[in-house]
């Protein structure tokens, strides 16, 4: 899950799955045409070019082709466009195989949406502008961090024992026990849809139920399957949870977004998927990964150079940049968000096939924002709360970002998505902080008095190098083009979280796709 809040829901669904008998005879692990885990493993071997170690679950970088003894490194001209985690990882893995690529980044700062805020808060506390949490199952980024000599902090173990999330709807607290009880009525249709849909739904492979669910919005699914529909407390909770999880109103999102996350939790599926727990952060900030990758790629990175056009030139590619320069490359890795590619780059002469162009021009991009506020104390602990909350009072959701950080102060992130983010966009952090505190006070009594006055705001939809937070599928998009995002076009490769089937929207998706792109390039050059 992209947010801690879906983790809480998944935990409750798992408890329900253990309590509710299997009345329809469907087995969670009987997913057709293939289980998610078998898909991940197959994709890792055949598409991403990585293998999963049976001992550690880590990406095996030795799966990348090595140069043969006495063989010279390839002389192909390789351009990687995008200096975020995906592009830098691809260049780093290629360099480990003796293949040198040049990375072109439009910004003067590397890292893209992996970016740590070290300047706003007192006491040396930090927050993440962008991607924040790393699952235990995110093997590619965990291995990369380890290789680079970085330490991962376990933020879950830093939570006080017995602390719980807070849910607040219709003017009243909505306890985890109540949520769990209400979920029991939803479990059977959720499980049935997951099994009948199969995983994954792609433009090349799908089931009848998968296509039907893809053509249905999350809001409609809630209205059809939750007692009381989207106006019930559980309906409101699911609506808010998925609005922030993907950064879009639930009326816009494919129901498969909900089915594949929550339907995968429960009897049988815990084995298949492993835990999803947002357990880790990089000690000192996630962008230390970026800094160390950049240091390892000294002399291979060009910043302040924005791509404006991609043209197929025989077997090569011509890239046009905003400084009016052009380069010709034998192989290209486009590690840019599709939101930027469609708005900032001319592809009229690229020769990209129709399905690829459909994915580039239509793929959803989340509208998420982060408002981070520092407090004198971690007041939420005194309320028996972990910092995680959902509410209908207007602020949507929170979590604590200072778990495993020293000091008595604490930072809460107010995380928003969809129309709430649109209403915040362009406003000053101090005004947003006052608005948040007024809306959060009924949920966290006494919180306002603890605010230090410090706040920062990350408005990703207005960030011109991202134009949003991370990718998601709108209604109907799984069957229209899912899977095409990562497909090569000749000697042009694609990387970024938006190209990752299993880790779309995660830092892991960026790293995993960079490994895959490096594999594709090295296989083509070395064999």
Where are these regions (language model features)?
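N-terminal secretory signal peptides
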Residues: 1-34
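Conserved flavin/dinucleotide-binding core of flavoenzymes
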Residues: 7, 14, 42, 61-66, ...
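N-terminal secretory signal peptides and thylakoid transit peptides that target proteins
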Residues: 25-50
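N-terminal glycine-rich phosphate/pyrophosphate-binding loop and immediately adjacent elements
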Residues: 70-199
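Generic structural signal for small/hydrophobic residues in well-ordered secondary structure
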Residues: 85, 111, 145, 222, ...
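Active-site/ligand-binding neighborhood in enzyme catalytic cores
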Residues: 202-309, 314-316, 338-340, 345, ...
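Central helical "cap/lid" subdomain
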Residues: 311-312, 321-382
């Amino acid at each position: 899950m992209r947010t801690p809040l879906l983790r809480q829901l998944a935990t409750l669904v798992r408890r329900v799955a253990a309590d509710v008998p299997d009345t329809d005879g469907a087995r969670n692990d009987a997913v057709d045409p293939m289980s998610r885990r078998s898909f991940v493993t197959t994709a890792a071997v055949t598409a991403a070019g990585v293998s999963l170690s049976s001992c550690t679950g880590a990406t095996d970088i030795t799966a990348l082709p090595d140069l043969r003894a006495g063989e010279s490194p390839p002389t192909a001209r390789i351009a990687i466009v995008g200096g975020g985690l995906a592009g830098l990882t691809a260049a780093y893995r290629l360099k480990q195989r003796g293949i040198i690529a040049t990375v072109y980044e439009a910004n003067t700062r590397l890292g893209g949406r992996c970016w740590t805020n070290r300047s706003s808060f007192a006491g040396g506390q930090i927050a993440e502008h962008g991607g924040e949490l790393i699952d235990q199952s995110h093997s590619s980024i965990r291995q990369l961090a380890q290789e680079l000599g970085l330490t991962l902090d376990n933020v879950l173990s830093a939570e006080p024992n017995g602390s719980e999330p807070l849910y607040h709807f219709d003017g009243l607290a909505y306890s985890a026990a109540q949520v769990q009880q209400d979920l029991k009525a939803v479990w059977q249709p959720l499980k049935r849809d997951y099994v009948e849909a199969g995983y994954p739904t792609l433009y090349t492979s799908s089931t009848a139920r998968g296509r039907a669910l893809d053509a249905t919005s999350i809001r409609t699914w809630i209205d059809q399957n939750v007692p009381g529909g989207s106006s019930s407390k559980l309906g409101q909770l699911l609506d808010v949870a998925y609005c922030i999880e993907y950064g879009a109103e639930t009326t816009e999102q494919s129901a498969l977004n909900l089915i594949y996350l929550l339907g995968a939790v429960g009897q049988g599926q815990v084995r298949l998927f492993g835990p999803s727990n947002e357990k880790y952060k990089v000690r000192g900030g996630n962008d230390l990964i970026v800094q160390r990758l950049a240091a390892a790629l000294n002399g291979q990175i060009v910043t302040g150079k924005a791509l404006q056009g991609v043209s197929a030139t025989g077997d090569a590619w011509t890239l046009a940049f905003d400084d009016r320069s052009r380069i010709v490359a034998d192989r290209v890795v486009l590690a840019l968000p599709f939101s930027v590619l469609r708005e900032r780059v001319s592809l009229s002469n690229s020769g990209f096939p129709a399905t690829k162009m459909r994915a580039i021009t239509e793929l959803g991009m989340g509208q998420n924002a982060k408002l981070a506020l520092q407090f004198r104390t971690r007041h939420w602990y005194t309320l028996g709360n972990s910092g995680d909350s959902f509410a209908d009072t207007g602020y949507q959701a929170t979590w604590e970002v200072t778990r495993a950080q020293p000091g008595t102060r604490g930072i809460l992130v107010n995380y928003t998505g969809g129309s709430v983010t649109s209403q915040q966009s362009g406003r000053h952090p101090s005004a947003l902080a006052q608005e948040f505190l007024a809306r959060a006070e009924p949920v966290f009594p006494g919180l306002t008095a603890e605010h230090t006055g410090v706040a920062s705001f990350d408005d990703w939809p207005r960030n011109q190098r991202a134009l949003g937070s991370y990718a998601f599928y709108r209604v109907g998009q799984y069957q229209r083009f899912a899977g095409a995002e990562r497909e090569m076009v000749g000697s042009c490769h694609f990387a970024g979280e938006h190209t990752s089937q299993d880790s779309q929207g995660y830092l892991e998706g960026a790293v995993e796709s960079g490994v895959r792109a490096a594999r594709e390039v090295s296989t083509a050059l070395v064999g």
